[in-house]
Amino acid sequence: MNKLITVAIDGPAGAGKSTIAKIIGEKFNLMYINTGSMYRAVTLKALENNISAEEVDKLLVMIDGMDMHFENDELILNGENINSLITMPNISKNVSAYASIREVRERLVNLMRKMALKYSVIMDGRDIGTVVLKDANFKFFLTASPEERADRRYKELMEKGIEVNYNEILQDIIKRDYLDSNREVDPLRKAEDAIEIDTTGIGIMGVVEKISSYMEK
């Protein structure tokens, strides 16, 4: 039986993690698990059910009733493909509040680890290399300037026909950087053994080539 491979990709919002992880996953035949989308799914359901980030017990009951899995890189929640719903600006603004709750993270991290025990996986998020997959075979930390990340997110949403304001996105990214880096539970930080790649000014395929070269050594 072939040994399972685990790849961790971490970095701030808009650093290109999911796009790059998806391509690497296809190239090396790894299951791509977008962990951020799992927290976004929790945020979506919480907002739909009017459950605030302070109502932890209600949140945990809600999560226990959520059936999440991935099909062709897309998140399926209770039988419904919710990828288009969880990228809406309202979810982006609220996700940090729910993702910073210790009990919520414990529930989802447990689910992520179970996936990694069954399949060769590539996961992207904020704490994959430091918490979720501490013993990952490969760890990468992607960065980019806030302006570059805001520009990417702006173009991505406009292409989807969602009217957005660049400055609002930039301020949202700066705020999320602060919240993600300073939260008490599993803050955004680079694992000591992770390879850092600044994606500012580098095309997606340039980053893919860099990561591939490390994995093919």
Swiss-Prot record:
Q: One of this protein's GO BP terms?
A: pyrimidine nucleotide metabolic process
User: What name does the UniProt record give this protein?
Assistant: Cytidylate kinase
Q: Could you tell me which Pfam families the record lists for this protein?
A: Cytidylate_kin
| Enzyme Commission number | 2.7.4.25
What CDD domains has UniProt attached to this entry? CMPK
Where found in the cell? Cytoplasm
What is the organism field in this record?
Clostridium perfringens (strain SM101 / Type A)
Catalytic activity line of the entry = CMP + ATP = CDP + ADP; dCMP + ATP = dCDP + ADP
Query: What lineage, starting at the top, does this entry show?
Result: Bacteria, Bacillati, Bacillota, Clostridia, Eubacteriales
